[in-house]
């Protein structure tokens, strides 16, 4: 069924009791052409495999329910304000896919291009933002460099006067914004299912079978499932799943916390990031401030953080907006992020025939979902990288071709 005004009116006559299921709950087949592990980027990959490459004998294996992983545990921000030539075109393509997301998948994902503003607090940071903005514009993106007065016009309640970290200006990307994170896996699942993809929930991979250097299938909690090609898109569990195939990945897993405050009157129109500390905030449609900051800094697979980081993140928020000191936090949650050694992702085939890897997303996984799935589908279908992900090779760390957007070196917890 196509969602629209007519289907809404039709189902309103029955009190909305006769809506069909958005996707099927199939039993696993004995084998598939392609299996994708992970219900975040994996769903996007399956959709684009079916749509762009007509490969429909595909299964997506999710160990929990759809949306229970990082795809539903983020702060909903989308942006493409990168500078390096390896990153910028990729994220700009993702932004373009976001802009057509709802029309393409026939699903209301609440795509809101309300703008993303990065604050700067020194002359050097202002110059760096000017360079970044120029790089964005060269690659076809949008960027506006604001001085302190320009920022004050947008957000007069920020700490401008006698501030510990004076605001010198900011870099605004008007096309950035937010997307309802729960709606993204639902939209991809519905669209992929309509094209024949099997989405198998509560199916955890426990092993990978390799015969003579080639993938033969996966062992799961629902039995063995054979396949010709296997794509790993397991986010924070990438290292564990990769180890099942004998891969030792240049990735660390860390917990990252996110928070939402009590509901407030309209306050923050867009997305704002603090330049003197790691803090980013937007306001949801319910009025809650959705915010986050640094990862907890220690390796963990637990989806919960510690109070020291809660204090650290909120201190940064209050330094930017003193009025937040009186706002109560409603709840918090955690997700496991796969931190690569240079802060950039890996989308590549491996040395094992038929095995492909999508991992190392650090803080940037959600915003990259469409482009990640699109490029990963191309890599799996054609057994070669697309130009957009050609630089995201697994062997770049050995070859010395790292993509270090922040320039902090091989320290995963700093990216």
What are these model-predicted stretches?
Residues 89-92, 119-128, 171-190, 200, ...:
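Short beta-strand to alpha-helix junction loop
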Residues 1-33, 51-55:
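Extreme N-terminal leader/targeting segments of oxidoreductases
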Residues 220-269:
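Central helical "cap/lid" subdomain
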Residues 318-415:
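C-terminal catalytic lobe of FAD-dependent flavoproteins
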Residues 248, 263-356:
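Active-site lid/adjacent beta-loop-alpha segment flanking the redox-cofactor pocket in flavoenzymes
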Residues 50-71:
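Glycine-rich FAD pyrophosphate-binding loop
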Residues 75-157, 278, 308, 316-318:
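Dinucleotide-binding Rossmann-like beta1-alpha1 core, especially the glycine-rich loop
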Residues 171-229:
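Helical element adjacent to the flavin cofactor pocket in flavoenzyme catalytic cores
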